[in-house]
Amino acid sequence: MQSWQNPGIKDVLAKCKTPPKPFGIPISQAASTKVAPPAPVLPSTAAIPGVLAEGQSWKVVWSWEGNNVDGPIAADKGTVMFANNDASNVMQMDPSTGLAKIVYRDTNTGGAVSRGKNGMLFVAERGLGSSIEELQPKRKMFATSFNGEPLECVGGVINDLMADARGGVYFSVTGATESGVFYANPKGVVTQYGKGVPLANGIILSPDEKTLYVTNGATVFAFDVKADGSLANQREFGKLRGGEGGDGSAVDQQGRVYVATGKSVDVFAPDGTFAGTIPGPQGLHGTFFGGRDKKTLFAIVFYGGWGTPSARNMIIAIPLMAQGYTGRAK
């Protein structure tokens, strides 16, 4: 369970210097928790110049019960790695066969994974005692506190993360007080950045790692990244048009930004110009490039009743003309 669902969260927050407001996600209820809900409809698409040819369509490459597909990245030989939120595992899946295996266990409700250009692999852990854990090259706790207090004291819940080439990690906290944008430097010391970003969610670096993009509801913010990893010059990068609010994001080789919106993927040019929308099914909440040539756009989809036995996840894929950034996993 995530930290906010744990009864012990009250004791943790009571000890914070400035206790944050309680955080929660409403439990949704499907028509029946005994019968699997129907899979979402996968719509056809219109062309986006240089990105997507007309008439392409999504296909399902993997599905499973529960809230168990989140924070995915490309992995070796065209495979996909993702976090199992409910099961507290990290899995690796081959889209060509649909076969998956557990590669890391006991992640304390791990909700997203990220691998930097230097090969370091991290997972964001959403359970009580929230943290950023390093998985490779050596498994160990990387960041567990902010200003001497548990990460829970910032409010909300850890959502997404982005490892950089320095050995640090940017991460988002949805529901944080004031701003949910954080950076854990290579020593694991955490700093908070930004103003007016309480709904921070998807977080991604540009290919040259000089710009950090963060979604906040229907707005995508951009930050300049300094040489030491600190952030400056917060600004609005773009407004989403295709859905309900920004979530997991990706970049391609040309620096375009792809943002999951809840029912589509919105695409922006590097200067923030809106390029188009790739329609998808309801519940589309994350996207990334993968495949051996990184010309396949994958997306993760949640449907059914959140927090109920009817919850389902699936991974879908669509071929693109654009190529995902090849210099790192995502």
PLM regions and their residue ranges:
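Sequence-structural signature of mature extracellular/luminal beta-sheet repeat domains
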Residues: 1-330
